[in-house]
Amino acid sequence: MLTVALPKGRIAEQTLEIFAEIFGGEFKFEGRELIMEKEGFKFLNVRNQDVPTYVEHGAADIGVVGLDVITEKELDIIQLLDMQLGKCKVAIGIKNEDELDWNRPNIKVATKMVNIAKNYFAQKAVGVEVVKLYGSIELAPLVGLADAIVDIVETGNTMRENGLKVAEDIMDSSAHLIANKNSFYGKKEEILSLYEKIKAVVESRG
């Protein structure tokens, strides 16, 4: 039996639709259900940020999670497939009236994605102070906590509604199928068989 970690919400629903397309029947978590067993799979309904942790530590054989989370956590897992779900960007946001001037001293950047932000600015040889927040990132520039933010952008509406604009894109992100290294070698046939089936569905959707 393969254990599959899925992030709560839309990505889980869309992934389960792919399983339904492959195996038939209905794949759905009922109410507050955290574990579902069906067709020889055990599905775990976990927080988005926790999916790669479950996979890396072997509590799940495979999982589905955004590339931004994989990049931020820098974990030792195998990336198998871009599932083309939950497409978004990681971007820098600033106030509408501001312009980026990275030569200024003492620039503060607020974000949940500390590693992504630090690595990006290090590559640009820009010295910034990264302020870690856990939510409502858009608030930081409005109250003077930070000069800019690094955050997930899907439509850009949240930034616009808060008087911010996208200044630079850092990376594209979408949901990826990942695997635990030991599971991949120990259950290679099962995982690759499932991978091929999921890949066929993803490609058929264009």
From Swiss-Prot:
The keyword Transcription regulation does not apply. Disulfide bonds: none annotated. Pathway: Amino-acid biosynthesis; L-histidine biosynthesis; L-histidine from 5-phospho-alpha-D-ribose 1-diphosphate: step 1/9. The keyword Transcription does not apply. SUPFAM superfamilies: Periplasmic binding protein-like II (SSF53850). It is an enzyme of class 2 (transferase). NCBIfam families: hisG. This is ATP phosphoribosyltransferase. It comes from Sulfurovum sp. (strain NBC37-1). The gene is hisG.
